[in-house]
Amino acid sequence: MTSYIERLKSAASYLDTVPDEHHDFRKPTAKVVTTQLTIATSLGIFALLSFSILLKKWPRLYASRRYKDDGNLRLPSWNQSSLFGWLTVLYKIRDEQILEYAGLDAYVFLSFFKMCIKLLSIFCFFSVCVISPVRYHFTGKIDDGNDDDDSESSLIHLVKRIVEGSGDGDNHSAPERTNVYLWMYVLFTYFFTFIAIKMAVAETKHVVSTRQAYLGKQNTITDRTIRLSGIPIELRDSEALKTRIEQLKIGTVSSITICREWGPLNKLFHCRKKILKNLELKYSECPRELRTRQPYSENYHLLGNEQSGAVTHGENVPSSNNNDEDTILYSQISLGERPKMKIGYRGIFGKEVDAIEYLEQQLKFIDAEIIEARKQHYSATPTAFVTMDSVANAQMAAQAVLDPRVHYFITRLAPAPHDIKWDHVCLSRKDRLTKVYSTTVFIGLSSLFLVIPVSYLATLLNLKTLSKFWPSVGQLLKDHQWAANIVTGLLPTYLFTLLNFGIPYFYEYLTSYQGLVSYSEEEISLVSKNFFYIFVNLFLVFTLAGTASNYWAYLSDTTKIAYQLATSVKEFSLFYVDLIILQGIGMFPFKLLLVGSLIGFPLVKIKAKTPRQRNELYNPPIFNFGLQLPQPILILIITLIYSVMSTKILTSGLAYFIIGFYVYKYQLIFATDHLPHSTGKVWPLIFRRIIVGLLLFQLTMTGTLAGFEGGWVLSSCLFPLPVVTLCFLYDFEKNYLPLSKYIALSSIREYERDNSTVNSANEEESYAYPYAVSELEGPMLD
């Protein structure tokens, strides 16, 4: 009896300690997760309803590709009177139609989401049916993490302490002994790793085969062209370069464009574009009947003629003199209603002149300058676009080593003509390298600088630290539990959502000045930059939540890394549940609203005064993988890391990818354009980051198992996994990567035999420098 009373006292003393614990933001209660789910669901439903209503009202804004369609795509339609009719149509669109409607890049992007849905569905099944029940049987916890801070889990601990007789307080802090159920962790770490690798490899084979079949049918000028860099000075001439390439017996050259330092011509065209835009605006402000002086041009110029001519004309026709004077007077009055402008500094100072006449003179002047500039000689750069006579010859040339010297005659497949950034192509080698390295260094320094606010944010959101800096706020949170839950449970996810909203656009801006020669190269580079930022800042820095001294300590003693990572991961489990719920259920549906276009549309519509601006008003927004892809990859990595430990994160991640798949599917097919010509080359970036996620998963599980008494035996069982994982990465780099970059000759020859190669609708494109050959168009008037 005394023993039983002692157990009750011990359990009561344990319960007394629960309410007094400071609620760390890394350990939000399950009630906070429920609140987050309610908020996110409400936001998601609101966004879905709003989009469905706005789609009916403004179909040209939210389904702009249907109206831009020239008849070749034949995008599916739905009943406009139905509020949710678009959902059924979207669901029925097959993979082959995605490839037809949105292109190869969109197909690869959505294939990644489909793979994640299949993978997490398998993980969720085993987690719900096997892992969680076994773990609950042995520990009384559904998930392995600090998710037991609410009253329900406290009751579970109370019962276990009474039944097991663990009244000694020392046992609460002692290392947990190794249990039989921990071998389940080892088993499922192996199982989940091999399932993930198997599905990633299977999806790689699928993407590669689809890419080979899709691109093997193409016979466009883009598919026949290579970009040649490192051209020696003596060969920077079209005829000499053509002769040298054909001497190598790799095919016949159809055409060559030597890139030159056309910088002055670029500046003239940029200036002309501004003048043309201002001229069209002034025409739009002018009454239609006064836009041209043609009816009064003769009389208008008479004002500047010699009086003798006018007198002579008047002597012969005296009856018309009064009519001419009336016409001149009318012309002066009418022309006074035309728009005026000052030609001084920024249009504020200087003489006031007729705006249309002045801008037309400026346009004629700069056109003359451009015509003259086109005749000038410009120094050749070491880059050229070489169009071969066949796709097969272009593929062989792109994969061949043409010169024994280093950095000479380097071949790559050429981007599409519309994908080229000619301002960067025209740069000299010195200027381009300066841009590349200076921008890279600046981005690296910016990334390091951003570690500081993130780490401080992670520290300051701790209730103890808040009390130290703001005692009144800390006391308020201690007195009001609901406020503490909001600040330490919900606030971090929203702050990080805001913090990670603007930084990717900042990196996009910096990348545009990096000197890359095509938009597709910028896009792929942006994927790497943004993923590095959110992975380092949102995951590593925020999870470890320490200062620079902590990181150096981890590096000095590498044995601490796995254990510290496992400990931090456990503490952050419900934080990541909150984050994934908010991003997936709450924020994803808002992407359908195209908030930027929605907010800016009324303003842009008001400012759209010229026919050119009105034509561009309903142009679809540009879909940039560099902005959209990094976060889903990070969410997949987080779910992989927690796959054995947290059923909540697995189910949240599954919901994230299901919602994301249909949101992006709609955007890529109906609402946005993807202009860069990257031909599915984003898949290698995805595969490598899946491998990184698996390695972190294995490292975390090693640290988790090592934390138990005698856990070194279990941890040592996982040592082969990283080696096996890296072997699959090596196999991918050696065998699959070339097929992700190039087209196999057998794929090309197969479709050549079938006579089914596709001559693209863009055959009018060429690699001629556009500013050297394009027409000098006049203002567009309505």
Swiss-Prot record:
The gene is CSC1. It is a multi-pass membrane protein. Its main location: membrane. This is Calcium permeable stress-gated cation channel 1. Activated by hyperosmotic shock after mannitol treatment. The chain crosses the membrane at residues 35-55, 117-139, 182-202, 441-461, 486-506, 531-551, 579-599, 622-642, 649-669, 682-702, 710-730. It is found in: Membrane. It comes from Saccharomyces cerevisiae (strain ATCC 204508 / S288c). Acts as an osmosensitive calcium-permeable cation channel. Keywords: Calcium, Glycoprotein, Ion channel, Ion transport, Membrane, Transmembrane, Transmembrane helix, Transport. Belongs to the CSC1 (TC 1.A.17) family. The keyword Secreted does not apply.
